[in-house]
C-alpha cells in the first residue's frame, strides 16, 4: 500500500516532471540559435515523460485493485490517460526529431515547414490534455478505495466474474 508520505513524495516528483515538460514546451523555441542546448532539453523532456509513464504504471501495480486481478478495471478507468500519454510521447519525439533535423546544420535561419507547424500545434494541444489528464489520474490514484478491500471493489469483482 502507498503510504501518505510516499504518495506525497511520488506526487511531488510527478508534478516536478510535468513542470519541466511545461517549461521546455514554453521556452525551447527561444533556444533555436543553440541547437545543442535545445537537443539536450528535448532529450531530458522525453526522458521526463517516460519517467512519468513508468511512475503511473508503478502506482497502478501498487493498488489493491491490480493485486486482486482487476487489471481491466484499472485500464477502463484510466484508459484515456494511458492512450493520451502514449500519443503525446510519440508526438513529442516526432516534433523533436523533425526540429533537430531541420535546424541542426543551419540554426541561424528560421525554418518552419507546413508539416512542422501542424505537428507543433498538435503536440502543444496534446501537451495541454496530457498535463490535465495526467494530474487528474495521479490525484485520483491517491483515493484510498484503490488500496483496500471495499464493498465497491467486491461489486466490481462480482461483475467481472459473471
UniProtKB/Swiss-Prot annotation:
Glycosylation site list: 6
Note from the entry: TMEM138 and TMEM216 genes are adjacent and are aligned in a head-to-tail configuration. They share some cis regulatory region and display coordinated expression. Genes were joined by chromosomal rearrangement at the amphiboan to reptile evolutionary transition around 340 million years ago.
Family: Belongs to the TMEM138 family.
Superkingdom per UniProt: Eukaryota
GO biological process: cilium assembly
GO CC terms: cilium; microtubule cytoskeleton; vacuolar membrane
Subcellular localization: Vacuole membrane; Cell projection, Cilium
Name recorded for this polypeptide: Transmembrane protein 138
Transmembrane segments: 7-27, 41-61, 80-100, 110-130
Noted disease: Joubert syndrome 16: An autosomal recessive disorder characterized by oculomotor apraxia, variable coloboma, and rare kidney involvement. Neuroradiologically, it is characterized by an abnormally large interpeduncular fossa, giving the appearance of a molar tooth on transaxial slices (molar tooth sign). Additional variable features include retinal dystrophy and polydactyly.
Biological role stated in the UniProt entry: Required for ciliogenesis.
Keyword terms of this UniProt record: Cell projection, Ciliopathy, Cilium, Cilium biogenesis/degradation, Disease variant, Glycoprotein, Joubert syndrome, Membrane, Transmembrane, Transmembrane helix, Vacuole
Membrane topology designation: Multi-pass membrane protein
Amino acid at each position: 500500500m502507498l503510504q501518505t508520505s510516499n504518495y506525497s513524495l511520488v506526487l511531488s516528483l510527478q508534478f516536478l516532471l510535468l513542470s519541466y515538460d511545461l517549461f521546455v514546451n514554453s521556452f525551447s523555441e527561444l533556444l533555436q540559435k543553440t541547437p545543442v542546448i535545445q537537443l539536450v532539453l528535448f532529450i531530458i523532456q522525453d526522458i521526463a515523460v517516460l519517467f512519468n509513464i513508468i511512475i503511473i504504471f508503478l502506482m497502478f501495480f501498487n493498488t489493491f485493485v491490480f493485486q486482486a486481478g482487476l487489471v481491466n478495471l484499472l485500464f477502463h478507468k484510466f484508459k484515456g490517460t494511458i492512450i493520451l500519454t502514449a500519443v503525446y510521447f510519440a508526438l513529442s519525439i516526432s516534433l523533436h526529431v523533425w526540429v533537430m533535423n531541420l535546424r541542426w546544420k543551419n540554426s541561424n535561419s528560421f525554418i518552419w515547414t507546413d508539416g512542422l507547424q501542424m505537428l507543433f500545434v498538435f503536440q502543444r494541444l496534446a501537451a495541454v490534455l496530457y498535463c490535465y489528464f495526467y494530474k487528474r489520474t495521479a490525484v485520483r490514484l491517491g483515493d484510498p478505495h484503490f488500496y483496500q478491500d471495499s464493498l465497491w471493489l467486491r461489486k466490481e469483482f462480482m461483475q467481472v466474474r459473471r
